[in-house]
Amino acid sequence: YRSVFRDDLFAGKTLIVTGGGSGIGRCTAHELAALGARVVLLGRKEDKLKAVADEIREDTGREALFFTCDIRDEDKVRDTVAAIYKQVQQVDGLVNNAGGQFPSPVAMISQKGWETVIRTNLTGGFLMAREVFMQGMNKSGGSIVNIVADMWGGMPGMGHSGAARAGMDNFTKTAALEWACAGVRVNAVAPGWIASSGMDTYPEGM
């Protein structure tokens, strides 16, 4: 395995990856650790987080921490970010990767299903970014990367996710302008369709 990035690019940096127990988050955490970062994994399932942390330690010999957290829960997010800062003192970056959705035409999405996807893909990312900023980055600076989706022309079959990701794109632009004076960069990345474990729940052929 050889990265396209410079060796030790993130040496001495502490980076949080939400949704770090599987899929894109897991791969992102491995890449960041391989480039020298100390990664902090967040997710809802402790067994998955522990497995990825163990993989990273074995592959890189570097420290990997993990915390269970439902990013849709404001109090839990606040407390988890506080616990992270207590352990690592400074957070240099946040990858807002956690998300989830289910395939459905717009007409068949219930209010509960709609609100669940919005809370996961928009509200959760906002809460994480806000708390990381307010609890440390407003003083130390840093970088926030929000993982979105290729929703620019609409997302047929995924209207709830497209709406949430479009909201996250606008939030990204607003936060970038408001937090630039604190030395915080905020960007969004739309990786497109990735054949990760997240697609295991989708119907065949989608």
What role is predicted for each listed range?
Residues 13, 62-63, 90-91, 136-150, ...:
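Active-site loop of short-chain dehydrogenase/reductase
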Residues 145-167, 172-181, 193-194:
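Catalytic loop of short-chain dehydrogenase/reductase
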Residues 181, 192-206:
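A glycine/serine/threonine-rich, flexible loop-to-helix segment
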Residues 14, 21-22:
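Conserved glycine-rich cofactor-binding loop
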